[in-house]
Amino acid sequence: MNNKTLLLTGASGYLGQHLAVRAAEKFELYSAFGANPSGITAGQPVQLDLGARAAVHQTVDRLRPQAIIHAAAINPGSGDAVAMQRINADGSRYLAEAAVAVGARLVFVSTDVVHSGLTPPYTDNAPPTPINDYGRSKAAGEAAVAEIDPTAAIVRTSLIYGLEKMDRGTDSFVKRLESGQTLILFNDVIRNPVWVESLAEALLKLAELDFAGILNVVGRQALSREAFGRRLLAYWGIDTNNKVQAGHAADISATIPLDLRLTCTKAEQLLQMTLYGVDDVLAMNGSKNLNT
């Protein structure tokens, strides 16, 4: 029987689904969701409105978890600036308050988008320079967590992908291709994609460590969105029918950070693990053809 208790927010999301399965092996797990519990893969489902301060405090006080991994967020495309502020900034503040009140270890999942993309590569302690609503809301969440709970771990990560279940980004690419649209992938947007299994392992390790502060947890290989997208489409065996073209984000919007390369040597040393790049992960896992 697991004696340690863990509250996982965002448990019905892509990262949360992978985290929950792993976490349930080590913890008595409470899997928090906002509105729809259908994506919960493990743990005891708990409905939680992160934007309601009283509800957050009451839920955490009732469950009294020893650790909290805060993976819930409103991402671009799933909510506007108001929703992002409510959940990503205010909700993170409320959760940090509640964690301190019950003495819970807090691990907050943040993003590389807190940076502008103008001065890469970004070290773990590089100050935020957000240029869009999502980045500003997550930077505000970071600041609140650091102020309220200086012992918390703040994890900046990047594009998350998996090879058992198609990630949200690749799935959207496939839907566009299937509808006959031409898919434009940016070759001037650079990221360090992270394998969901690596990220989940890192977060669970941090839940049991006393590291405090900001830690970059990303794959060690930097790729353009075009190169990354083409690799994953090939892995899943998707016939692109020459419908994939390179594009330039800089020509479209001034609020898309271009080069968000992050360093990850500190995380690899602290967590004693290799944060594999995309090519290494694909080589270890072969390919999956959905057309057969």
Language-model-derived ranges and their functions:
Residues 87-92, 137-138:
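Short alpha-helix in the Rossmann-fold core of NAD(P)-dependent oxidoreductases
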Residues 202-205, 209-258:
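Mid/C-terminal beta-alpha module of Rossmann-like enzyme folds, strongest
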Residues 224-230, 246-292:
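Conserved C-terminal active-site "lid" loop/helix of NAD(P)H-dependent oxidoreductases
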Residues 3-26:
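N-terminal Rossmann NAD(P)H-binding glycine-rich loop of SDR-like oxidoreductase domains
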Residues 143-191, 198:
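NAD(P)-dependent short-chain dehydrogenase/reductase
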